[in-house]
């Protein structure tokens, strides 16, 4: 090992800091022997995650030694305010050190100094040898070490601090952190600062004067009470700063690049068995692997004794709880509301959790004898700084809803670090993602259901009418479970770099964009829709009369029974399919097949199409307009389709028709306000381009690289004709083949779609694969890989589970094989449009433009653009979307402009 290799990394963990935090933040677990193990489990989980995230060539876990340090000699009151260590915590120190060593982490404990000093010395050695150092800690003192070669990471808050991060968080450069802390004081270490000087004042002074020495020199110029307080502490400040400076020259028994060790699997197995860590034992493999479900350890502790939750009944209680939350690295957060409609719901209460504690803040409960509550206005005045602070990390379950609710009260939630719904969606997309299911699955914890608290059906009461004591049990448990589920789920995501990327770089930032889009809403011309509804009604009456004439009698066109009688008993049409009860089917597939040869089924289909347009769109959409905004505000679900595709609900804006003239007219009602235009930016043939990238097929890549019409190019290959001689019918067939094969279409399906013989369809498919052998090879390899792994992945690492891929049932297995081919393309397309949304939103935000993102529909982004921003937006949106990822074929975006959505698309 060359100590001068600039690519090498030293990974250091502040073991004492994490031990304390894990003890106070995680459930109180006990081993089968009755030993406390909660902190041990938390630290070991963190170490395993760090090892996976940072491929370090040397690493160590550093602990404080027993006894006084040189700082105690200089200042006897140093850390004198700390209570004695709880016995359950003290009992875990030596077993933890033993476990760290077994895990392959050298352990360092040096008498007379603190862990911070040892870490600083090792980082200094590594810096001098050109190594990079990553320090995992929650201690702000170590920010003084940060430079271009030293980075801090905080696994509990998911925060990374480089020099820019230190400046952003503290307002000063790393080399001024000790000056900053000398002014603010360090309450944890009992080092006093200047009375009434907080982080903002300290940062302002250092920015203004340059250093602590300069602040001292200009003390006489600073007026007010803080100036007086500063002048009273001038003699103390140099000493306070000395106490806060970490030593970088501690005498150590080992060099930094000698801190290497391999895990001792036998020792680990013995320790995991002793501690009862069944999940970690299972990760080692062997007989114990199936001993218990993944989250058995916290489950038993959580279920055995329902937590005692706190009700924040008055302002004093809230202030005390807020002071504690401000010191927490991560807080579970949830809201209770008047309803579930995001744009109109208002607060009834809020719940918070950290460690093993949780509390409920009732705000607007109304029932006979309900006690006085703080009230929404006063509570938000107190909580707003914490709620909006980006440095105060929060975790929630479906936080987008809570962010809407707070926005309804004028609060912009900051510090959104994690969302357990998204964690579950990324890690286990095929599972249920609601909190009750997550708690049961990962904690073994059966939660109180909403129905248990509010009742069901006609007897259901509003949450505001729920008695506060009962509301506390339910609401605080939600925040508590959210926090606990995150502690189990996130380490699993963080341990796999590709999943971590999908979660952190796609899903979390996409949530913020979707929130913005939902709140922007879409302007709807309701008068136009009402006129269309009237016209559709007239057309339906016309089709109804034509159907009566074709049937030879009046009948109810909405009655399957009467349609059966007319079609199959009176007109003797062939029965194509039967219902489960043995009756002739009149579903859409049957009518479409019959419509090829008979007039009445065709009329019935046309009538049904008109009826659906009227009932689903022209009649219903105007009722969805928010009276306060005059706009339609849909709700985008990120955790809907396992491929990552977004779903739109209440109303669904992603299935607005486009294939028929009447359907397209509905899009005319989606309009821009006066002075603005609708801009549509749509990825062209995105899934085929992804297939070209994934398969590496030279024919497909060549067609896309040279801007050819890919369907015409495919037709030329399949039918063996020159590109300029391809007929319209040949191109149509090639288009069906291109898209059909992506969806795993068989020869039978292709024959049905094209209305040709199955043998002819098979010839087309064989010809296609003989010309595009890369596609065939990719499909075969993907199926084989899916059978082996049980899943497939998108280009960006989204995992798509295929539980039926090895099923003994041929139909289920073949369906899974089709999914294995299609899912990576659909999933990659979903990832791309999310990345595009993020890029466009970031640009709009950065440039402070008035342009609004208003819709995402499959591969299309829709914007509302003021006319004076139109040209810039068209160019920039196309550029951003086309360059959001570098595939092996170019991404092409078609941009259209109009007064309404139909004109723009």
Question: Which role fits each region the language model picked out?
Answer:
Residues 2-6, 29-30, 80-253, 440-442:
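Extended two-metal-dependent nuclease catalytic cores across DNA- and RNA-processing enzymes
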Residues 3-11, 15-60, 76-88, 97-102, ...:
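Conserved RNase H-like, two-metal-ion catalytic cores of nucleic-acid enzymes
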Residues 11-17, 135-138, 142-143, 152-169, ...:
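Conserved beta-strand -> loop -> alpha-helix junction used to position metal-binding or nucleic-acid-contacting
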Residues 159-188, 440-470, 479, 483, ...:
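A short, charged helix-loop
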Residues 232, 257-261, 840-894:
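C-terminal structured "cap/appendage" subdomains that terminate the fold
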Residues 233-369, 388, 397, 425, ...:
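Conserved "right-hand" nucleotidyltransferase catalytic core of DNA-directed polymerases
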Residues 461-464, 512, 516-519, 574, ...:
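Conserved catalytic core of nucleic-acid polymerases
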């Amino acid at each position: 090992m060359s100590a001068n290799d600039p690519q090498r990394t030293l990974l250091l963990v502040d073991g004492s800091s994490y031990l304390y935090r894990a003890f106070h933040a995680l459930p109180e677990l006990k081993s089968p022997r009755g030993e406390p193990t909660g902190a041990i489990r938390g630290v070991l989980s963190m170490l395993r995650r760090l090892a996976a995230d940072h491929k370090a060539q040397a690493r160590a876990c550093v602990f404080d030694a027993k006894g006084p340090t040189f700082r105690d000699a200089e200042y006897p009151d140093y850390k004198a305010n700390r209570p004695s260590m709880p016995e359950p915590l003290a009992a875990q120190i030596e077993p933890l050190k033993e476990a760290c060593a077994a895990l392959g982490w050298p352990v360092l404990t040096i008498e007379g100094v603190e862990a911070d000093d040892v870490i600083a010395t090792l980082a200094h050695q590594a810096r001098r040898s050109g190594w990079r150092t990553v320090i995992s800690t929650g201690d702000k003192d170590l920010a003084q070490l940060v430079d271009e070669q030293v980075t801090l990471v905080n696994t509990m808050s998911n925060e990374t601090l480089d020099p820019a991060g230190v400046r952003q968080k503290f307002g000063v450069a790393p080399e001024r952190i000790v000056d900053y802390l000398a002014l603010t004081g360090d309450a944890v270490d009992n080092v006093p600062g200047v009375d009434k000087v907080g982080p903002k004042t300290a940062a302002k002074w250092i920015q203004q004067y340059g250093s602590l020495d300069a602040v001292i020199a200009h003390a006489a110029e600073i007026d007010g009470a803080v100036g007086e307080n500063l002048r009273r502490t001038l003699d103390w400040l140099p000493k306070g700063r000395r106490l806060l400076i970490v030593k970088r020259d501690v005498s150590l028994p080992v060099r930094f690049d000698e801190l290497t060790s391999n895990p001792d699997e036998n020792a680990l197995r013995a320790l995991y068995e002793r501690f009862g860590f069944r999940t970690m034992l299972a990760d080692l493999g062997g007989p114990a692997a199936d001993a218990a479900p993944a989250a058995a350890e916290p489950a038993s502790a959580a279920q055995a004794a329902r937590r005692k939750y706190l009700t924040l009944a008055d302002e004093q209680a809230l202030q005390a709880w807020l002071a504690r939350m401000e010191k927490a690295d991560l807080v579970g957060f949830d809201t209770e509301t008047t309803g579930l409609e995001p744009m109109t719901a208002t607060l009834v209460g809020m719940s918070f959790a950290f460690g093993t504690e949780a509390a409920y803040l009732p705000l607007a409960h109304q029932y006979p004898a309900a006690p006085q509550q703080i009230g929404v206005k006063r509570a938000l005045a107190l909580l707003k700084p914490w709620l909006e602070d980006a440095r105060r990390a929060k975790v929630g379950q479906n936080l987008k809803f809570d962010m809407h609710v707070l926005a309804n009260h004028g609060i912009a939630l900051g510090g959104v670090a994690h969302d357990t719904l998204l964690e579950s969606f990324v890690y286990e997309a095929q599972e249920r993602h609601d909190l009750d299911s997550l708690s049961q699955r990962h904690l073994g914890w059966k939660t109180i259901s909403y129905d248990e608290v509010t009742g069901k059906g006609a007897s259901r009461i509003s949450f505001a009418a729920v008695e506060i004591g009962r509301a506390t049990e339910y609401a605080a448990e939600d925040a508590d479970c959210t926090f606990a589920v995150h502690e189990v789920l996130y380490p699993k995501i963080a341990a796999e770099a590709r999943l971590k990327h999908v979660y952190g770089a796609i899903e979390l930032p996409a949530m913020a964009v979707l929130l913005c889009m939902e709140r922007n809403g879409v302007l709807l011309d309701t008068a136009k829709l009402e006129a269309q509804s009237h016209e559709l009604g007239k057309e339906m009456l016309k089709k109804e009369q034509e159907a009566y004439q074709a049937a030879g009698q009046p009948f109810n066109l909405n009655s399957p029974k009467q349609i059966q009688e007319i079609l199959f008993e009176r007109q003797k049409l062939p029965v194509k399919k039967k219902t489960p009860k043995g009756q002739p089917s009149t579903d859409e597939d049957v009518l479409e097949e019959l419509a090829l040869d008979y007039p009445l089924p065709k009329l019935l289909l046309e009538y049904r199409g008109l009826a659906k347009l009227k009932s689903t769109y022209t009649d219903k959409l105007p009722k969805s307009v928010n009276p306060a905004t005059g706009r339609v505000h849909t709700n985008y679900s990120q955790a809907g389709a396992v491929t990552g595709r977004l779903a739109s609900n209440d109303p669904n804006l992603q299935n607005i028709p486009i294939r028929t003239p009447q359907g397209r007219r509905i899009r005319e009602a989606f309009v821009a306000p006066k002075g603005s235009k609708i801009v549509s930016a749509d990825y062209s043939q995105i899934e085929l381009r992804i297939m070209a990238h994934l398969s590496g097929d030279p024919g497909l890549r060549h067609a896309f690289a040279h801007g050819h019409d890919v369907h015409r190019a495919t037709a030329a290959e399949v039918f063996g004709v020159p590109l300029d001689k391809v007929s319209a019918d040949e191109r149509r067939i090639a288009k069906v083949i291109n898209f059909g094969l992506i969806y795993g279409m068989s020869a039978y399906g292709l024959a049905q779609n094209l209305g040709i013989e199955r043998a002819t369809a098979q010839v087309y498919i064989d010809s296609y694969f003989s010309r595009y052998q890369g596609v065939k090879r990719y499909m075969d390899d993907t199926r084989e890989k899916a059978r082996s792994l049980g899943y497939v992945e998108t280009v960006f690492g989204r995992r798509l589970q295929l539980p039926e891929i090895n099923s003994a049932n041929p139909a289920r297995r073949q369906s899974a094989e089709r999914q294995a081919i299609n899912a990576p393309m659909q999933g990659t397309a979903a990832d791309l449009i999310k990345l595009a949304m993020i890029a466009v939103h970031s640009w709009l935000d950065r440039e402070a433009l008035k342009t609004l993102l208003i819709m995402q529909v499959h591969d299309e982004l829709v914007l509302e653009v003021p006319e004076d921003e139109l040209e810039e937006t068209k160019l920039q949106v196309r550029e951003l979307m086309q360059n959001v990822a570098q595939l092996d074929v170019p991404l092409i975006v078609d941009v259209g402009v109009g007064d309404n959505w139909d004109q723009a698309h």
